[in-house]
């Protein structure tokens, strides 16, 4: 059986958040900044064939199960999957307070 492939789409907000994180990290170490961003992207891509790979987002109010989240290198990544799309919604450092959504 062939597994369905989902398309990953980064929202403008999540693109800006990962870019901001990268720019902050590269001030200390360019190689670490590159590694962290690559690891986050690789981790997101693990959900391409199974969007339920990561657990439900525990901070999402009234989560129907389509909002998922995971942590990588002290960053929390939130995405939502629908029919054929995995939409990355947020990338934030775990020291930041989560905003209700």
Show where each model-derived region lies.
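Enriched for short, Lys/Arg-rich terminal
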Residues: 1, 72-76, 80-101
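Basic, Lys/Arg-enriched alpha-helical interface segments
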Residues: 1-64, 101
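Basic/aromatic recognition patch in beta-strand/loop cores that engages polyanionic ligands
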Residues: 53-84
């Amino acid at each position: 059986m062939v597994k369905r492939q989902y398309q990953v789409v980064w929202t403008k907000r999540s693109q800006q958040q990962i870019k901001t994180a990268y720019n902050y990290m590269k001030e200390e170490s360019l190689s670490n900044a590159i590694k962290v961003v690559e690891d986050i992207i690789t981790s997101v891509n693990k959900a391409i064939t199974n969007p339920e790979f990561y657990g439900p987002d525990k901070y999402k109010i009234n989560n129907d199960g389509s909002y998922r989240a995971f942590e990588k290198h002290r960053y929390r990544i939130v995405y939502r999957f629908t029919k054929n799309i995995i939409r990355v919604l947020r990338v934030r450092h775990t020291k930041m307070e989560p905003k209700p959504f």
